């Protein structure tokens, strides 16, 4: 799974996910399913934000990469991917500026057009179940919830999906592609049900005699399909801005 993640996702996404896991004392090399889940969630958050701007009349517009509109304001503030201290600093700044209610938990995005925080969910389970879990945890009607699944389903607060249909379709297509690539490598079942995968693995290992030639790592080969999974949503200017904002690494 770790090899798949590093081959499938943009290096910046991988770096942010590693940083987030290490902040909580987790190892991406051991908790590989969580590593994949965090990368997927980060990518969905970035895709949710990219190409969406607010013009001088405070109207929401969509601008594809390469258009000369550098002065436009991004519609969404990305909070996910920052360390906890910086994330709360951003949240507090938004609340002080806009007057919106401060959330109890760190949200993923802030929508400057609708003036609300957004919690993004990506689930391997049924969307309604995951939505209710999110709502029960957040316990706030002020934070908007939007759930996506790997099967193309989605659910949002009051059926308000925020984005246009085409933008949401890009996210759904990407999630479906990730699922297909995992399945083709035999990784999907363990990603959906890690406990069952662990139990089955132990059972299988017990039936095997000790052998020095047993494989211990996932294949490093990249499938032809993965080579086409370039993250088109990540234009160079956006990548540079995000890297400068999120990753404050000193040059060695």
Swiss-Prot record:
Keywords on record: Decay of host mRNAs by virus, Eukaryotic host gene expression shutoff by virus, Host cytoplasm, Host gene expression shutoff by virus, Host mRNA suppression by virus, Host nucleus, Host-virus interaction
The UniProt record lists the keyword Lipoprotein: no
Protein location: Host cytoplasm; Host nucleus
Catalytic residues in the record: 80, 108
Top-level taxon: Viruses
Entry keyword Endoplasmic reticulum: no
Record-level GO BP terms: viral RNA genome replication; viral translational frameshifting
InterPro entries reported for this sequence: PA/PA-X (IPR001009), PA/PA-X_sf (IPR038372)
Main location group: host cell
Swiss-Prot/TrEMBL site (Important for efficient shutoff activity and nuclear localization) positions: 195, 198-199
Site feature: Important for efficient shutoff activity: 202-203, 206
Coiled coil location: none
Single GO MF descriptor: RNA binding
Function noted in UniProt: Plays a major role in the shutoff of the host protein expression by cleaving mRNAs probably via an endonuclease activity. This host shutoff allows the virus to escape from the host antiviral response. Hijacks host RNA splicing machinery to selectively target host RNAs containing introns for destruction. This may explain the preferential degradation of RNAs that have undergone co- or post-transcriptional processing.
Recorded domain comment: The probable endonuclease active site in the N-terminus and the basic amino acid cluster in the C-terminus are important for the shutoff activity. The C-terminus acts as a nuclear localization signal. The C-terminus is recruited to host protein complexes involved in nuclear Pol II RNA processing.
Similarity remark: Belongs to the influenza viruses PA-X family.
Name of this chain's protein: Protein PA-X
Species whose genome carries this gene: Influenza A virus (strain A/Chicken/Hong Kong/YU22/2002 H5N1 genotype Z)
Phylogenetic lineage: Viruses, Riboviria, Orthornavirae, Negarnaviricota, Polyploviricotina
Gene name in the database record: PA
